[in-house]
Swiss-Prot record:
One of its GO terms (cellular component) is fibrillar center. It is linked to Grange syndrome: An autosomal recessive syndrome of stenosis or occlusion of multiple arteries, including renal, abdominal, cerebral and probably coronary arteries, congenital heart defects, brachydactyly, syndactyly, bone fragility, and learning disabilities. It comes from Homo sapiens. Residues 463-472 have a biased composition (Low complexity). Interacts with YY1. Interacts with MAD2L2. Interacts with INO80. Keywords: Cytoplasm, Nucleus, Phosphoprotein, Transcription, Transcription regulation. The lineage of its organism: Eukaryota, Metazoa, Chordata, Craniata, Vertebrata. It is found in: Cytoplasm; Nucleus; Nucleus, Nucleoplasm; Nucleus, Nucleolus. This is YY1-associated protein 1.
Length: 796
C-alpha cells in the first residue's frame, strides 16, 4: 500500500522519476523514436490512465456498488421514463471522452476500462427494463379487476327475451317490405336511381348478414334462425330480379300537359298490380297510395310524427328541436304527443300501426281484410276479383280438355308444388281485363259532411192537403205544367226558424199577379206569426192558381217578404241570395188551375193589424172594431205556426150579409155577426194564446168545413196536419176554398205614411169577377217582372 501511495504521489509530480515508469526503452514492442520518447514521457496526461486502470482492476466491487447507488438516486429524483431517454446520451458522453484520451500507444490497459463501462451500462439497462415491466403489470391487474364485472353486464344486455325477439322479427319483416316498395317506386322515376340502388344494396346486405350468422351458429345449433333473414327477404330479392328483367315501364318524358298544383301522383299500374298480389307485401297498412316524386332539397326543416315520438334525434339541431316543441305546444296546434306530455307528464300509449303477422300467416294484400286495404285497392278489388275468376275458369276448362293433370306420389314434392303454385298464382304482369282505380274520388259535397246536423226541434213538419177535400172542378184544358205543380206536397218543405222581429219591408213579390180572388174580401197569413210592431202587418202571397185577373185597373200591390220562412221547390237549383226573405220562383201557369197554397186566414171586409202579445203569440185586431149584435156559430179551422201548442179562441164581430163568410181557425167558436148586411162593420179577431208545455202545436186539430157548395173557380181545401217534434212549417201547397158568393175583393195598398192597408175593390170589379165564367179564366197570366219596384198588372 505504501508503494502504491508513493507511486500516486510521484505521478502528480512532473519532476519525479516515476513519471517515466515503466521506462519507454523497456516497453515491449516499442517502436517509438528515442527523440520522441522524452516528449511523451514529459506529458502530464499520461498518469490518469494508469490510475483508472489500477482502480478498475482492484476495486471492481466498489465500482459496481457505487453505480447501483448512483442509479437508485437518479431514479428517485428523475424517474425511469427520463432515464430511458437519457440512456443513449450517456452512452455518447462516455464514448466522447474515450476518444479524447491522450494515452501512450504502448498502454493496452485502456480496453479494460471500456469493457467495465459497457458492463455497467448493460446492468443499468436491464434494471430499467425490469422497472418498466413491473409498472404495466400492476396497471393491467387493476384494469382487469375493473373490467370483469363490466363484461358480465354487457353480456346480459345482448340477450333478447321472447317479447323483444318477436317485436324485432315484426320490424325486420316491415323493413324488408318498405325497402322493396321504395325500390319499385324509385325504379319508375329516373331521378330516383340512387335511392333504387341503395335499397337494393340494403336488401343484399341483409342476405349477407344472414348467411354469415347461420354459418357461425349452425355448427353449435342446427335449428338456429337468424333475425337477419325474415320470411319475405328471399321473395323480395327474387321479385326485384324479376321486376328488372320482365317488367318494362315507360320512363320517357311525356308531352307537357297543364297540371294543377294539387294533382294527385297516381301509382304506376304495373307496380300497383305487384303490390296487390305479391306475398312480400304482407302488411297492407304499409302499402303506398301514390308514386314518388324527386324534389329538390328544401330549406325548411320538416318533422314527421315518428320523429315526434323519438327520444333522441341526432339529425336535428337543438334550435330546431326547441322551435318544434314550441310550435306543437301552441293553443291552435292540434292534439299531439308533446302537448299531451306537457299537460299530463306521462307518455301516451301508442297504438300499433300494423297487426302482428307470423311467417306462416303471410299472404298477399288482396287476400286480406278489406278494411285494412288502401283506398285504391278497395276500389279496384271488384275488377281484380272478376278477372281472377275468369282466369281460374279458363284454366279449369283447359285442364279438363287436355287432361294434363298429373298426380305426384311424392308428398314432399306435392307440398313444394303447392307452395310454388300459391306463390305464382297471380301473374307478374298486369292482365288486360283488370281496371285499377288509382286516383281518389273527390267527394261531391265535402262541406255537407262537416255541416252540423239539425236538431230535432228544428225539423220541419210536413203538411199535406186532405185527399177528401181536393178541388172538384177541373177546366177543360189542363196544361202540362200542372203535373209538376201537383207533386206531393211532402217535398215542399218550409223551414221555420225561431220567432224573430223582422223589419217590415214593403216590396212587390216576384211571380205574384194582382190580387183578385173570388170568395173572400182579404187575405192575411203570417206564416209563423212573428212578433212584430202593432203597426206592422204581414200579407201572405197567393199562389198563381188562386189569383184571378181583373179587367179593371188594380192598384199596385206591395207585399213584404216573410223574413221567418224560406220556400224550396223540389228539383230546382237555388242561387244564393244576399237579402233575407222568401224567394218566389217564376213559373207561367194558367189561372183556372187550382193549386194548394200556404195557410190563408180569410177575413171579412175590414182593415186589420197584427198585435204582438209576447212569447211568440200574436193577435189579429181590426183597426175600427164594431160591436157585434148577434152571435152565430161558424166552424173555424185555424193553422197557427208556433213551436208550442196553444188554443186560439177567436172573437169576431162580423157584418151580416146574404152569404156568410168563411174563416179558418183551429176550433169552433161563436162569432157575432151583425144583422145589417149593408153596414160594413169592421172585424175584430182576438187571439188569446195560452202556451201548453209538452204538447204538439197541432194535436187535436181537425179541420171543419162549412157545408156549402164549392165554387168552380175556387174549391175549399183544408190542410192535413202531420205531427212531428220539430216546429211545424207551413206547406206551400195548401189551399183555402172560398165560396163563390161569399167572397169579397180586397187588395193591399201602401199608404202615405208608409204602412199597409187593406182596401176593398170597386163594386164593379167585384161584380165582374163574380160573373166571370170558367172559360174566360183560361187566358195567359202576365208575370210580374223581377224588379221589385215595377207595377203588377193583369188582364182577364
Amino acid at each position: 500500500m505504501e508503494e502504491e501511495a508513493s507511486r500516486s504521489a510521484a505521478a502528480t509530480n512532473p519532476g519525479s522519476r516515476l513519471t517515466r515508469w515503466p521506462p519507454p526503452d523497456k516497453r515491449e514492442g516499442s517502436a517509438v523514436d528515442p527523440g520522441k520518447r522524452r516528449s511523451l514521457a514529459a506529458t502530464p496526461s499520461s498518469s490518469l490512465p494508469c490510475t483508472l486502470i489500477a482502480l478498475g482492476l482492484r476495486h471492481e466491487k466498489e465500482a459496481n456498488e457505487l453505480m447501483e447507488d448512483l442509479f437508485e438516486t437518479f431514479q428517485d429524483e428523475m424517474g425511469f421514463s427520463n432515464m430511458e431517454d437519457d440512456g443513449p446520451e450517456e452512452e455518447e458522453r462516455v464514448a466522447e471522452p474515450q476518444a479524447n484520451f491522450n494515452t501512450p500507444q504502448a498502454l493496452r490497459f485502456e480496453e479494460l476500462l471500456a469493457n467495465l463501462l459497457n458492463e455497467q451500462h448493460q446492468i443499468a439497462k436491464e434494471l430499467f427494463e425490469q422497472l418498466k415491466m413491473k409498472k404495466p403489470s400492476a396497471k393491467q391487474q387493476k384494469e382487469v379487476e375493473k373490467v370483469k364485472p363490466q363484461c358480465k353486464e354487457v353480456h346480459q344486455t345482448l340477450i333478447l327475451d321472447p317479447a323483444q325477439r318477436k317485436r324485432l322479427q315484426q320490424q325486420m319483416q316491415q323493413h324488408v317490405q318498405l325497402l322493396t316498395q321504395i325500390h319499385l317506386l324509385a325504379t319508375c322515376n329516373p331521378n330516383l336511381n340512387p335511392e333504387a340502388s341503395s335499397t337494393r344494396i340494403c336488401l343484399k346486405e341483409l342476405g349477407t348478414f344472414a348467411q354469415s350468422s347461420i354459418a357461425l351458429h349452425h355448427q353449435y345449433n342446427p335449428k338456429f334462425q337468424t333475425l337477419f333473414q325474415p320470411c319475405n327477404l328471399m321473395g323480395a330479392m327474387q321479385l326485384i330480379e324479376d321486376f328488372s328483367t320482365h317488367v318494362s315501364i315507360d320512363c320517357s318524358p311525356h308531352k307537357t300537359v297543364k297540371k294543377t298544383a294539387n294533382e294527385f301522383p297516381c301509382l304506376p299500374k304495373q307496380v300497383a298490380w305487384i303490390l296487390a298480389t305479391s306475398k312480400v307485401f304482407m302488411y297492407p297498412e304499409l302499402l303506398p297510395v301514390c308514386s314518388l316524386k324527386a324534389k329538390n332539397p328544401q330549406d325548411k326543416i320538416l318533422f314527421t310524427k315518428a320523429e315526434d315520438n323519438k327520444y333522441l334525434l341526432t339529425c336535428k339541431t337543438a334550435r330546431q328541436l326547441t322551435v318544434r316543441i314550441k310550435n306543437l305546444n301552441m293553443n291552435r296546434a292540434p292534439d299531439n304527443i308533446i302537448k299531451f306530455y306537457k299537460k299530463t307528464k306521462q307518455l301516451p300509449v301508442l297504438g300499433k300501426c300494423c297487426e302482428e303477422i307470423q311467417p306462416h300467416q303471410w299472404k298477399p294484400p288482396i287476400e286480406r281484410e278489406e278494411h285494412r286495404l288502401p283506398f285504391w285497392l278497395k276500389a279496384s278489388l271488384p275488377s281484380i276479383q272478376e278477372e281472377l275468376r275468369h282466369m281460374a275458369d279458363g284454366a279449369r276448362e283447359v285442364g279438363n280438355m287436355t287432361g294434363t293433370t298429373e298426380i305426384n306420389s311424392d308428398q314432399g314434392l306435392e307440398k313444394d308444388n303447392s307452395e310454388l303454385g300459391s306463390e305464382t298464382r297471380y301473374p307478374l304482369l298486369l292482365p288486360k281485363g283488370v281496371v285499377l282505380k288509382l286516383k281518389p274520388v273527390a267527394d261531391r259535397f265535402p262541406k255537407k259532411a262537416w255541416r252540423q246536423k239539425r236538431s230535432s226541434v228544428l225539423k220541419p213538419l210536413l203538411i199535406q192537403p186532405s185527399p177528401s177535400l181536393q178541388p172538384s172542378f177541373n177546366p177543360g184544358k189542363t196544361p202540362a205544367q200542372s203535373t209538376h205543380s201537383e207533386a206531393p206536397p211532402s217535398k215542399m218543405v218550409l223551414r221555420i226558424p225561431h220567432p224573430i222581429q223582422p223589419a217590415t219591408v214593403l216590396q212587390t213579390v216576384p211571380g205574384v199577379p194582382p190580387l183578385g180572388v173570388s170568395g173572400g174580401e182579404s187575405f192575411e197569413s203570417p206564416a209563423a206569426l212573428p212578433a212584430m210592431p202593432p203597426e206592422a202587418r204581414t200579407s201572405f202571397p197567393l199562389s198563381e192558381s188562386q189569383t184571378l185577373l181583373s179587367s179593371a185597373p188594380v192598384p199596385k200591390v206591395m207585399m213584404p217578404s216573410p223574413a221567418s220562412s224560406m220556400f224550396r221547390k223540389p228539383y230546382v237549383r237555388r242561387r244564393p241570395s244576399k237579402r233575407r226573405g222568401a224567394r218566389a220562383f217564376r213559373c207561367i201557369k194558367p189561372a183556372p188551375v187550382i193549386h194548394p197554397a200556404s195557410v190563408i186566414f180569410t177575413v171579412p171586409a175590414t182593415t186589420v193589424k197584427i198585435v204582438s202579445l209576447g212569447g211568440g203569440c200574436n193577435m189579429i185586431q181590426p183597426v175600427n172594431a164594431a160591436v157585434a149584435q148577434s152571435p152565430q156559430t161558424i166552424p173555424i179551422a185555424t193553422l197557427l205556426v208556433n213551436p208550442t201548442s196553444f188554443p186560439c179562441p177567436l172573437n169576431q164581430p162580423l157584418v151580416a150579409s146574404s152569404v156568410s163568410p168563411l174563416i179558418v181557425s183551429g176550433n169552433s167558436v161563436n162569432l157575432p155577426i151583425p144583422s145589417t148586411p149593408e153596414d160594413k162593420a169592421h172585424m175584430n179577431v182576438d187571439i188569446a194564446c195560452a202556451v201548453a208545455d209538452g204538447e204538439n202545436a197541432f194535436q187535436g186539430l181537425e179541420p171543419k168545413l162549412e157545408p156549402q157548395e164549392l165554387s168552380p173557380l175556387s174549391a175549399t181545401v183544408f190542410p192535413k196536419v202531420e205531427h212531428s217534434p220539430g216546429p211545424p212549417p207551413v206547406d206551400k201547397q195548401c189551399q183555402e176554398g172560398l165560396s163563390e158568393n161569399s167572397a169579397y175583393r180586397w187588395t193591399v195598398v201602401k199608404t202615405e205614411e208608409g204602412r199597409q192597408a187593406l182596401e176593398p175593390l170597386p163594386q164593379g170589379i167585384q161584380e165582374s169577377l163574380n160573373n166571370s165564367s170558367p172559360g174566360d179564366l183560361e187566358e195567359v197570366v202576365k208575370m210580374e217582372p223581377e224588379d221589385a219596384t215595377e207595377e203588377i198588372s193583369g188582364f182577364l
